[in-house]
Regions:
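Double-stranded beta-helix
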Residues: 135-197, 217, 229
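Nudix hydrolase/Nudix homology domain
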Residues: 271-275, 280, 340-394
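Conserved Nudix-box catalytic region and its N-terminal flanking loop in Nudix hydrolases
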Residues: 262-310, 394
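Conserved N-terminal beta-strand and adjoining loop/helix that marks the start
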Residues: 126-128, 247-267, 283, 288-289
């Protein structure tokens, strides 16, 4: 359990280092896991370098199904520290190991709240970073800018989702080398600006860069969907750390559209099969290719344009529900009173008056209620294309 002083340091500075928190035997076990699972997940960029040529390589996706990698997900110090700092039960949103090979280039200044990424669009998450070697001058320090997270930028707005004011980029002089060493645990706020130097050593610079979100703050794009095999590699208690998992693929996406009248109303399309939420089969958006597939906002918005003739400025994740042989990723949007008063291709029904027997999937009411549930605190998800022009778009 973290002390009050440690929690205050994290809140004020945006990071906290627990020296030597990860046992040497655990690091060695992780190294064996990496040896058995080459870091080839990458960015899906066809022009990316070929491992192990100079570059930065990613081990992610479903790699945690290997017990020699997955065990660290439920490491007591990591999980308890995340719980203390998030003030909520933590759930894993990303399992990532980076391998920067000799002469691999560094990363420029950035922070990692990103509204298009399953691993970056929760409104309350943190990094748990564990170096497998000393991040020194030769292998490449990870620099942080203390206090640059500026959480006062996050505030309530006129919608059910939180608003975020534009980030303030720190000056070069504000970055420090925190002196990370093998086996340390760096806990880092999602908004903290950081950068990494190139690897000028003759050995690989490897580290664990997992992300945990507060359970009540789902990613705006939806979670990266872990396979059941990942969950089965964990203990019964550890399985609580995986928010969503399945042996099915996400195949469709739909939108819950609500508005407030005398009571909450929900929009449905009237089809031959019954009442259905607008949406359809997914298409993978490849505007910003990366490993954490799961953002189907572009597909959902396309269906809303075609079926409802509306362009929503954002959508936010509700849940994944069975549809056919796959899963349906469902997003939500709440109308305000400023829309132009035209009719829609479909029907608005008071929530209490929806005829359940006419619903196509039977889970629609559950999805609406989850969207309206105030215990979930959401952000505004964007498509990849919307974020190409400004990766820190708010």
């Amino acid at each position: 359990m973290l002390s009050k002083t440690q929690i205050e340091q994290f809140n004020n500075q945006g990071y906290l280092i627990l020296k030597g928190a990860i046992d040497e035997l655990d690091i060695q076990r992780l190294e064996q896991g990496v040896a058995n699972n080459p870091p080839l997940d990458g960015t899906l960029d066809p022009n990316a370098p070929v491992y192990p040529n100079p570059g930065r390589y990613t081990l992610a996706t479903q790699s945690a199904r290997d017990p020699d990698l997955g065990f660290i997900i439920e490491h007591e110090t990591i999980v308890n520290s995340a719980r203390d700092l998030l003030s909520d039960d933590p759930v894993l949103t990303a399992y990532v190991i980076y391998d920067r090979t000799p002469d691999g280039t560094g990363l420029p200044v950035h922070h990692d709240y990103k509204r298009w990424r399953p691993v970056g669009s929760s409104m309350h998450w943190l990094f748990t970073i564990v170096p497998f070697c000393d991040f020194d001058e030769t292998s490449g320090p990870l620099y942080v800018a203390p206090g640059s997270h500026r959480t006062e930028r996050v505030h309530s707005g006129e919608t059910p989702c939180l608003e975020v004011a534009p980030a303030i980029r720190p000056g070069d002089h504000e970055f420090i080398d925190p002196g990370l060493q093998r086996g340390d645990l760096l806990l880092m706020n999602m908004h903290l600006w950081h950068r990494a130097d190139a690897n000028r050593s003759n050995h690989h610079r490897v580290g664990l860069f997992n992300k945990y979100a507060a359970a009540s703050y789902p990613p705006a794009t939806g979670y990266y969907l872990f396979h059941d095999d990942v969950v089965n590699a964990l203990s019964e208690e550890g399985r609580k750390l995986i928010a969503v998992h399945s042996d099915r693929e996400i195949a469709t996406t739909r939108a819950v559209l609500v508005r407030e009248r005398e009571e909450t109303e929900v929009f449905f399309l009237e089809t031959e099969d019954g009442l259905q939420l607008p949406g359809g089969e997914i298409e993978f958006e490849r505007a910003i290719p990366d490993w954490d597939r799961g953002n189907f906002i572009a597909s959902c918005q396309q269906y809303l344009r075609e079926q409802v003739r509306i362009e929503t400025p954002w959508l936010s994740y509700i849940g994944d529900y069975p549809e056919g042989d796959g899963l349906c990723r469902v997003y939500g949007y709440s109308f305000n009173d400023n829309g132009f008063p035209v009719g829609y291709r479909g029907i608005w029904l008071a929530l209490s008056q929806v005829p359940v027997e006419r619903l196509c999937s039977r889970w629609e009411i559950e999805a609406v209620e989850r969207w309206l549930d105030p215990k979930f605190i959401r952000g505004k998800g964007l498509s990849q294309a919307a974020c190409r022009v400004d990766q820190f778009a708010y």
